[in-house]
Amino acid sequence: MKAKRFLLAVMASSALAAQAQVNINIDAHNRGPKISPTHYGIFFEDINHAADGGLYAELIRNRSFEDGPKYGAPADMQGWTTEATEDATISTKLIEPTKKNPLLNSVQHHALELNIKASIDAPVFLINKGFWGINAVQGRTYRLSFWAKGKYNGTVKATLRDNEGENIYAETEVSGFPADKSWRKYTATLQSDSNDPKAQFALVFDGVGTLDIDMVSLFPPTFKNRENGMRPDLANMLYQMHPKFMRFPGGCFVEGQESPDNAFRWERTIGPVEEREGHWNVNWGYRTTDGIGFHEYLQLAEDLGAKPLYVVNVGLWHGGKTEVEDLQPWIDECLAALEYANGDVTTKYGAMRAKNGHPAPFNIEYLEIGNENNQPDPRQQSDRYYERYDKFREAIRAHYPNIKLIGNVVAWGDDNPKWESTIDVDLLDEHYYRNPAWFADAFHKYDSYPRTNPETGLPAPKIYVGEYAVTSGFGDLGNMNAALGEAVYMMGMENNSDIVPLNSYAPIFVNENDAKWRPDMIRFNSSRVMGTPSYYVQMLMPQNVGTQVLKVTQHNPYADQMLTASVTPAMSHTGFATWQTKASFEMPDHELKPEHLETISGNWKRNGDGSVSQTSMRQQCVAVLPNIVMDGKHYTLRYRARKDSGDEGFMIVFNYVDRDNYCWVNFGGWGNTQHGIEQIVGGNKMQTVTKRGKIESGRWYDVKIEVTGDNVKAWLDDDLVFDTQLKHDTTKGIFSSATLDERTGEMIVKVVNTSDEATTAAINVQNFKVRQAHVIRLAANRGTDENTLQQPTNISPVEQVLSPENDSKVLVEIPAYSLNIVRVKN
């Protein structure tokens, strides 16, 4: 044993890894839990124009003339323009319903009135540029529809054209004119003869009169040829992931903001599209048509081969709530949605589903009650969550006892959230947005999760990791370091599929023209789409999941001593910071002269008593003291700090090198609910450790920070709050796992190398005869490498046939920065 330890130490402390061999030993009879049939899924939310202008195939922007520049502003002609040739005129006006001039139906609040004076030789044009361009594809057929009424004599043509209107790619005359006083639907098809990702759509008029127009729609072919369906290239990206379930409609999209009218209300999203009112997606800054409605979500899940997982609103939205005592309408809305999805055609809503083209039930088996609504701070849309959950639970259990119910736990600022209630729940939804090192370090996170409730002896709630992604240290769009950290975490969940039966990365989509969140798994524009390295990890893992875990013994030369470099810099500075809070600071051991204070951001001033105050309510207000220089080996600093007003507490900055590299102890962060240590590395922030806690206003606190190498201790009024180690932004090493696919008789071995050194893995198997093997590999030259729309497959999977050494051993090269999936046939 001593010899083995000595050998590992020597190997780990050398530059070593390039030639070191990792031994991965697997006994096919030494089995772990069964893999859950729902283990890998997807999470869809309309963020970054993921729906309108994205997965939803509609090409016309502002098709019903209801959009405006922002929430609360009047509707305008967003997306639409007009042109007139010489000797012709066209004027437009958004009209509202009147008794004499009703609109198409009660949910339409505006239509477009056109006053036209044109001729065959001098036409006028109503133009829509779509969502940052309409993708005209040679040979592709497009379906046009719109509603119109009025007094107009002349013809109407529909065209696809270039931006200047000089080149016409498709043209057809719309039959049925002249129009009359009644609303009529007009349809036509166009076929493009050219390619142009920035094409425009135009209606061309050559007559005289007045027309009211509404609900102008243009559809390309859709995924599985569904009417009102999905953009095929984006939907196919999802299909390739083999999702076992699809969570919808969010995310914050579930709750909405400012008003309950901005929440997802399922019943207004079904039926003919002209009868859907749409609503403001205030959280993400644009209006949604609800073209992807409740029915389309269910249909998409079915088309992907995924079980639907519906998230229901519990009477909370960003900025408001329905009191617990008044929840019944929300509960009724939930039950009606379940009847629509699961009910027989003899039921009210089951019959409605059949009318909409799907007589067979969709069968929702999983329902989440609320979205991130169990935070410790009630201001974070988290009012009396357990009472809300229980009211929904009772009603749902009474009507649908077999549906699995998912509860919310603390969604941010807590690495180990708990269900703090005795109310029964089937699964708990954990959310983690962290850095690559956190995910790699969480490889064994679920090994120790209890499988039974120690007090009752009953099975413990299972875990649904509903949202997770590397959001710090991911680069620009999402790099290989991020993907590999996530891959290691996924392997850990796979090993514990008995307690973590569901998981889903978030978010999926981003239109490059409106990125509200980074990173995202799939990036697109009007004509192109690419997957980040994280997408390929999310695709490869469920494609190669197996049916039962096999226990792995790994002899790893990369082990503990691989990370010998210190995180703490050799020389650094200290300072202060606030986040949406005004605060004051003192340093008893140092005089804070005005010239000693360097403002990075915020409004900082020196007071007459020698203290320093920050008076802005902005986020991330930072000041440093360049005259105080610390030795990275060991230092101790003392402070006094006071919260003066605002949302949070105060922060002590340490290990400050520059604006993009420093640490802080955050007392009273996350809405004054948590203390934490955070590291800012290369401009990206990552959590090191968190703990429940809050800061009182108007009270001076004594703070002490002691740094010894990478160890940090922090005291608040003589109470030791933290004693922890700073972390690298990536964890270097080799990680492995294995499963058996009882359907094919294959052994599937996953090996991740997060380091910059290549190695070789020897896969040694027992009770399993090796006959053939091949490896599916995702690799990059550097951990910071990414894909782009211009180079979408810079990092993408490749396959290689392997030659087994014998019937019990396979050697496989493990490149630096790689995920390797070895499929071994018996």
Q: What is each of the regions a protein language model found here?
A:
Residues 121-240, 327:
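Extended acidic/polar, glycine-enriched regions
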Residues 300, 391-404, 419-420, 426-427, ...:
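Catalytic-core region of carbohydrate-active enzymes that cleave or remodel glycosidic bonds
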Residues 570, 578-591, 598-599, 619-621, ...:
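C-terminal beta-sandwich/jelly-roll accessory domains of carbohydrate-active enzymes
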